[in-house]
Swiss-Prot record:
This is Rhamnulose-1-phosphate aldolase. It comes from Escherichia coli O1:K1 / APEC. Binds 1 zinc ion per subunit. Pfam families: Aldolase_II. It is an enzyme of class 4 (lyase). The gene is rhaD. Pathway: Carbohydrate degradation; L-rhamnose degradation; glycerone phosphate from L-rhamnose: step 3/3. InterPro entries: Aldolase_class_II_sugar_metab, Aldolase_II/adducin_N, Aldolase_II/adducin_N_sf, Rhamnulose-1-P_Aldolase. SUPFAM superfamilies: AraD/HMP-PK domain-like. One of its GO terms (molecular function) is rhamnulose-1-phosphate aldolase activity.
Length: 274
């Protein structure tokens, strides 16, 4: 019998959650992570599955995700503990045939359940599947320190925030030319914040929750982690720059245009226009 904890997807989740905790982005039970899988990924590990998988209904049906398996972090679970006990802190779930709920196939032992932000994740997965023709498979939410800090001092506007991050580090425009979506402050763990996040995910691979954290989407765990890491690095630079009295010089609009042309990306027009 193959051990599912040695699979690429469990090992990938262990690395991503451990790295995020070491970055300081996921204190206590902060943050959540979901990865969309294929049946072929989990097929070799059926012998590891629960004999009687628990079924949990979704608060709203998501037919686009019907019959789709995911690996997810658990509600109330600490990222720092995933590496110590993957089966207690992670779970593999599979949405049922009509998208009305899901079965917990593996993990989430001792009656644990998936992250409370699962509605936001699933709704965002739906939008990123449509926006990227199925390419994006990961949704990651974390409490990236400097990005959160900037939501207290910058205007919480997509164009303004995006332009500042682009100017904070040259690679940012290349990594997220589609900019950063921003929500108003909302109560977490609700369908409402999930729907608002998904709406922004139609246009942006990064979405900020002011005074709370960030959502990122990408095709792989590495790409999604790297996306957030890049934005957070720029935010860290900006925090230092602002604390030293602000910018004396920066990357100009013409230089940002040249950067986009060199790397074949189309920058968010509203941010470029500022």
């Amino acid at each position: 019998m193959q051990n599912i904890t040695q699979s690429w997807f469990v090992q990938g989740m262990i690395k991503a959650t451990t790295d995020a905790w070491l970055k300081g982005w996921d204190e206590r039970n902060g943050g959540n992570l979901t990865l969309r899988l294929d049946d072929a990924d989990i097929a070799p590990y059926h012998d590891n599955f629960h004999q009687q998988p628990r079924y949990i209904p979704l608060s709203q049906p998501m037919p686009l995700l019907a019959n789709t398996p995911f690996i997810v972090t658990g509600s109330g679970k600490f990222f720092r503990n995933v590496q110590l006990d993957p089966a207690a802190n992670l779970g593999i779930v599979k949405v049922d045939s009509d998208g009305a709920g899901y079965h917990i196939l593996w993990g989430l032992t001792n009656e644990a359940v998936p992250t409370s932000e699962l509605p936001a994740h699933f709704l965002s997965h739906c939008e990123r599947i449509k926006a990227t023709n199925g390419k994006d498979r990961v949704i990651m939410h974390c409490h990236a320190t400097n990005l959160i800090a900037l939501t207290y001092v910058l205007e919480n506007d997509t164009a303004v925030f995006t332009r500042q991050l682009w100017e904070g580090s040259t690679e940012c425009l290349v990594v997220f030319p589609d900019g950063v979506g921003i929500l108003p402050w909302m109560v977490p763990g609700t369908d409402e914040i999930g729907q608002a996040t998904a709406q922004e995910m139609q246009k942006h691979s990064l979405v900020l929750w002011p005074f709370h954290g960030v959502f990122g989407s990408g095709p792989t765990l590495d790409e999604t982690f790297g996306l957030i890491d890049t934005a957070e690095k720029s935010a860290q630079i900006l925090v230092k720059v602002y604390s030293m009295g602000g910018m004396k010089q920066t990357i100009s609009r013409e230089e940002l245009i040249a950067l986009g042309q060199r790397f074949g990306v189309t920058p968010l027009a509203s941010a470029l226009a500022l």
